[in-house]
Amino acid sequence: MNKFIDNWKSSGKIKNIAIGASAILIIIIGICAYFYYSHYTEQEELKLAKERKEKQIKNAQNAITDFYTKAFEGANITQLIKVLSEINISRIPLQETGFYEDYYSCNPNECDFKYVLKDNAIFNSQNKLFFEKSYEPIFSDKELSYTNVGSLMNQNSLSELFNQDKDINLVSCSDLLNYIYSYNSSKKQVNDKIIITSLPENSVASQESSYPEYRHSYGFMVGQFTVNHSDNPFVMETFWLGKPFQKSFLITGLTKMQNTKNMVTLEGKFICKK
């Protein structure tokens, strides 16, 4: 009997020890789990913070790149003269077959043309050749229209340097504006002036100031202008001849209005250093 009681007491002590050990083990596991979870959570927060920062940087830099990709679209003065020359050459076959050019409009990617049959002329549908490509017309009984004609008006040295991630040096906005204002004040005829329609601005200035070392952080500003002048390429070339800062001017629109005698409205931008 005494032996049974002794065994029961020993068994109770063992159980108490086992319970105590289990409790200690649970506490240790809990502490380890807590520190592991805390460390894991901290690492996840650091990872998420890093990802957010990287995304923020990427978005800012993409915004800068997108701004200048758009800013550098257009034709430089040399390319403008080439396009006007092609417009004048390409209208000759249509004029010789009884049509007159009523309207055209070009942007950096494409042009639209409209020709109207002259009085007493015989209608004849025909393709239009433009920069060695042939375009079929949409026609009615007295009109020929050509749409989506490749304009080649998106060529300039600024976009080439930009696409090669090279340095670009431009005149300051104060010097360029001073020149335009001075030039305009010396001209009496509106067709001899460069009309500023929007002063220079930069929609990504804050991003550029945050990431000045980014390869596309040029610190440029973009203004808008128009010019009303003859679409004769020689006359247009004379208009721009000798003007300084020509690299800063890009042409984005070219429109011959209806009922005008070979007069064209240039729409463009001027880019300068702030």
Describe the residue ranges of each PLM region.
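Primarily periplasmic coiled-coil/stalk helices
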Residues: 33-82, 164, 183, 190-201
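Generic detector of bulky aromatic hydrophobic side chains
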Residues: 3-4, 10, 14, 42, ...
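Short helical patches
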Residues: 1-10, 37, 44, 173-176
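N-terminal positive-inside, membrane-proximal cytosolic segments immediately preceding the first
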Residues: 1-28
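Generic intrinsically disordered, low-complexity segments enriched for polar/acidic and small residues
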Residues: 1, 31-37, 211
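Generic surface-pattern signal
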Residues: 6-13, 62, 69, 185
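Periplasmic/lumenal scaffold domains of single-pass inner-membrane subunits
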Residues: 85-274
